[in-house]
């Protein structure tokens, strides 16, 4: 699944499906960003998404919070 921090994908028309988010915890063995991406992908897949756009990250003492918009190509 494509994950980008822009609000568009070149040469693609998009249908917005909803906001998805993920959390990566600093004290786990898995990488924080990878963990957050995996959680977002699961939510987006459940919505039938092809990609997640406009992804934003918030870093904290205990990990990372990521949120973006799940979209379907039309």
Locations of the language-model features?
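Short, well-ordered alpha-helical segments
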Residues: 15-57
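Compositionally biased P/S/T/G-rich terminal and signal peptide-adjacent segments
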Residues: 1-20
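Short, solvent-exposed loop/turn elements at beta->coil junctions and helix N-caps
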Residues: 7-8, 55-59
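C-terminal edge-of-domain segments
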Residues: 62-74
């Amino acid at each position: 699944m494509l994950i980008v921090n822009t609000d568009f994908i070149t040469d693609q028309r998009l249908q917005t499906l909803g906001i998805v988010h993920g959390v990566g915890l600093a004290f786990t063995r898995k990488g924080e960003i990878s963990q957050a991406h995996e959680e977002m992908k699961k939510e987006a897949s459940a919505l039938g998404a092809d990609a997640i756009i406009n992804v934003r990250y918030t870093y904290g003492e205990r990990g990372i919070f990521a949120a973006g918009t799940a979209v379907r190509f039309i």
